[in-house]
Design a protein with these regions (language model features):
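Extended, charge-enriched "interface" segments that sit outside catalytic cores
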Residues: 1-47
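Glycine- and acidic
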Residues: 17-29, 48-60, 88-97, 144-157
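Active-site capping/gating regions of soluble enzymes
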Residues: 41-46, 68-85, 94, 98-160
Length: 160
């Protein structure tokens, strides 16, 4: 799918509280593993709180759809909640920009992500839950893959 097609699909899903699948629906092996992991996280956070998990780090973030897909998966696993403003993700979603192309696209990816209504609602919810005096969005900037991607000099320059 193109990025535009992925975004259209994800936007539709994020406007719905209904599950995309059922707990017993047959999924592929990778999807089953991911959902089992997320459901384990949901059970754990229900018992110990969301601070026990930290954040969902999205390795090799290349586009907005990479980040929004995490929200849909979180919804499927019960890691979202409905607020007066709308649905939010209980756990922060953190982009990890690793290649030189991704580092260069980083400002546009972050602008789109931070301006997205689901992200804005989620950041406000997370702020309220942690009683922080400010909204907080973590961003990880990778070194090793950008180094492999373009060499030491190009990697350092793009990280700078």
């Amino acid at each position: 799918w193109s990025e535009a097609e992925r975004l259209t699909f994800l936007e539709t899903e994020l406007h719905s509280a209904r599950p995309f699948t059922t707990a017993k629906a047959p999924l592929g092996a990778e999807a089953t593993t991911v959902m089992a992991c997320l459901r384990t996280i949901e059970r754990h956070t229900a018992h110990y709180g969301t601070n026990c998990i930290g954040s969902f780090i999205v390795s090799m973030t290349r586009s907005l759809s990479d980040l929004l897909a995490v929200y849909v998966l979180a919804r499927e696993a019960g890691l979202t909640v409905m607020t007066d403003e709308g649905m939010v993700c209980k756990i922060p979603v953190v982009p990890l920009l690793e290649t030189i192309d991704d580092l260069e696209a980083g400002p546009a990816i972050l602008q789109a992500f931070l301006s997205h209504p689901f992200t804005q609602r989620s950041l406000r919810y997370q702020q309220q839950q942690t009683q922080a005096g400010y909204l907080k969005q973590q961003v990880m900037v990778g070194y090793s893959d950008s180094n492999k991607d373009g060499g030491i000099l190009a990697s350092q320059w793009n990280l700078y």
